[in-house]
Regions:
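Short, intrinsically disordered low-complexity segments
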Residues: 2, 18, 31-32, 128, ...
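Sequence-structural signature of mature extracellular/luminal beta-sheet repeat domains
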Residues: 39, 56-384
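Short linear motifs in intrinsically disordered/low-complexity regions
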Residues: 12, 17, 22-24, 32, ...
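Compositionally biased, low-structure terminal segments
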Residues: 3-5, 36, 324
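N-terminal secretory signal peptides
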Residues: 1-30, 41, 46, 56
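Twin-arginine (Tat) signal peptide motif
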Residues: 27-36, 50-51
Length: 384
């Protein structure tokens, strides 16, 4: 309830100590004109109440904050293509925008012991940190050499793919400066590493090198690519770098199957080869990632392209999707046989995602300018 105090000189029930006749009786000067003036004051003040309430983030007459907007369950972000998708949906959970302020959010990686996500804001040349406990986003590192993909190895050390320096680096415990793990192949500089994963058997590192960080100043650098766009394996024991495939136009996001028998790589070919379609390519993994065999098309996207990808414990592939427009942008989910199970529709194009939380049942999604979370009934595979 809005309470407004009537001015003393206009209140007929209160004495005015400044007046000699202040005995509780109506003041002699309180005439009809004065009462009309008081009514006008009250009306104006009451009219201002809704605006004042909104300015304070409250719904007039309700008493709760105006944002985020309430969502009626079940959320309409779930889109089913195959009934098998329903087992991964939760009806009473919203898509939450946790933070906004990036230009192109990328490279999300979950740190379990620290309960945080590191992600890149490439054009702003910074790495950000989302704290699961507080829900707050803070600056982790700036400058960050226009880093893109990030992950944590099996010792908990952060690996980052740097665009402007065209190298793969690792942040060791003694920090703060990163150790360079790879920056050239056969005497030529790498194009610009993009995304990275780590095999648990021997800590072997697999990363993609499409060169996006060398195409525009906006995301790092401008220079001619001297190497074919490729996927590499790095042996951390001896530093040997091996090209394991160049049979892909623009290798981007990548992920192992939960048993490490398959490597999935997103091909964002249409960005520089408009006659080609965006795809996810699959290979069988040999020798802990040192060799790839049995190349095959796993999924083909008619519009837009898949970028960062993850797998769950059932072997499904969850693919961040952008540049497809409404009805396409968001997350696409594929069964191990390549059947599209469903989608999570998003208000922005999405470049990356990660399963986070103690149970790895919550999606952290990098939209273009914002980051989001969504609880699922799936559980992310325990892969980097």
């Amino acid at each position: 309830m809005l309470r407004v105090q009537t001015p003393k000189s206009l209140d007929p029930t209160k004495p005015d100590p400044a007046r000699p006749d202040a005995d509780g009786a109506p003041a002699a000067g309180l005439d009809r004109r004065s009462f009309l003036a008081a009514g006008t004051t009250l009306a104006a003040t009451a009219a201002m109440a809704p605006a004042a309430a909104l300015a304070q983030g409250m719904m007039p007459g309700q008493g709760w904050p105006t944002g985020p907007e309430p969502v009626r369950y079940p959320s309409d972000v779930w889109l089913v293509h195959d009934d098998r998708f329903r087992q991964y949906m939760i009806g009473n959970t919203p898509l939450r925008r946790e933070w906004t302020g990036s230009l192109w959010a990328e490279g999300s990686a979950w740190n379990g012991p620290g309960r945080y996500v590191v992600f890149s804001d490439i054009p702003n040349n910074r790495q950000m940190r989302w704290d699961e406990v507080t829900g707050q986003v803070s600056l982790l590192r700036m400058p960050a050499n226009f880093s893109n993909g990030n992950t944590f190895d099996w010792q908990g050390r952060q690996l980052s793919c740097e665009h402007s320096t065209a190298r793969l680096v690792r942040y060791n415990w003694e920090g703060p400066w990163p150790e360079v793990l790879a920056e050239e192949y056969e005497g030529k500089p790498l194009n610009a590493p993009n995304d990275v994963v780590v095999h648990p058997e021997d800590d072997g590192i697999v990363f993609t090198d499409p060169g996006y960080g060398s195409h525009w100043w906006y995301e790092g650098n401008v220079r001619e690519l001297e190497l074919p766009t490729s996927v590499y394996h790095l042996d951390p024991q001896n530093g040997q770098l091996t090209r394991i495939t160049d049979e892909i136009f623009k290798p981007n996001g990548l992920a192992f199957a939960p048993d490490y028998s398959v490597l999935y790589v997103a091909d964002t070919a249409p960005t520089h080869h408009p006659e080609e379609q965006a795809k996810i390519i699959a290979w069988d993994v040999e020798d802990n990632g040192r060799r790839l065999t049995n190349r095959r098309e796993f999924a083909v996207l008619e519009r837009g392209f898949h970028d960062g990808i993850r797998t769950d414990v059932d072997g499904n592939v969850w693919a961040a999707t952008a540049f497809g427009g409404e009805g396409v942008d968001g997350v696409h989910v594929y069964a191990p046989d390549g059947t599209k199970l469903g989608q999570i529709l998003m208000p922005e194009g999405c470049a990356n995602l990660a399963f986070v939380g103690e149970r790895r049942n919550r999606l952290f999604i990098c939209g273009s300018q914002s980051v989001y979370t969504l609880y699922t009934a799936a559980q992310g595979a325990h892969v980097t």
